[in-house]
């Protein structure tokens, strides 16, 4: 095997090993009880949205039944879902945060 063939083989191996992680959407689901201000607070606190972005997402949740807070690798998405659901329960709101593959 020539040196050129070895280099090409190594380049192929490296490219196939560097796959992007699967990404997941973090979703807030609408309910009839959680105040809009609380949803905005969640979006600012956990997803670092400014007031305008948080308001737009909150309105999408209100009108469409759900809204995307962000798209993250699985581990981060799973952590954010758990944090939001725990924070909502601590504040006695039924708000549900979930994830789905992007």
Swiss-Prot record:
Disulfide bonds: none annotated. One of its GO terms (biological process) is proteolysis. It holds the Pfam family ClpS. InterPro entries: ClpS, ClpS_core, Ribosomal_bL12_C/ClpS-like. Belongs to the ClpS family. NCBIfam families: PRK00033.1-3, PRK00033.1-5. PANTHER family: ATP-DEPENDENT CLP PROTEASE ADAPTER PROTEIN CLPS, ATP-DEPENDENT CLP PROTEASE ADAPTER PROTEIN CLPS1, CHLOROPLASTIC. Binds to the N-terminal domain of the chaperone ClpA. This is ATP-dependent Clp protease adapter protein ClpS. It comes from Shewanella pealeana (strain ATCC 700345 / ANG-SQ1). The lineage of its organism: Bacteria, Pseudomonadati, Pseudomonadota, Gammaproteobacteria, Alteromonadales. The gene is clpS.
């Amino acid at each position: 095997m020539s040196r050129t063939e070895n280099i090409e083989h190594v380049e192929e191996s490296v490219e196939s090993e560097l796959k992007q992680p699967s990404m997941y959407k973090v979703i807030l689901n609408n309910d009839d009880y959680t105040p809009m201000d609380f949803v905005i607070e969640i979006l600012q606190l956990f997803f670092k949205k400014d007031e305008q972005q948080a308001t737009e997402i909150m309105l999408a949740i209100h009108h469409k039944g759900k809204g995307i807070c962000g798209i993250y690798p699985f581990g981060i998405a799973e952590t954010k879902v758990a944090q939001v659901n725990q924070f909502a329960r601590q504040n006695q709101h039924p708000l549900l945060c979930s994830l789905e593959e992007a």
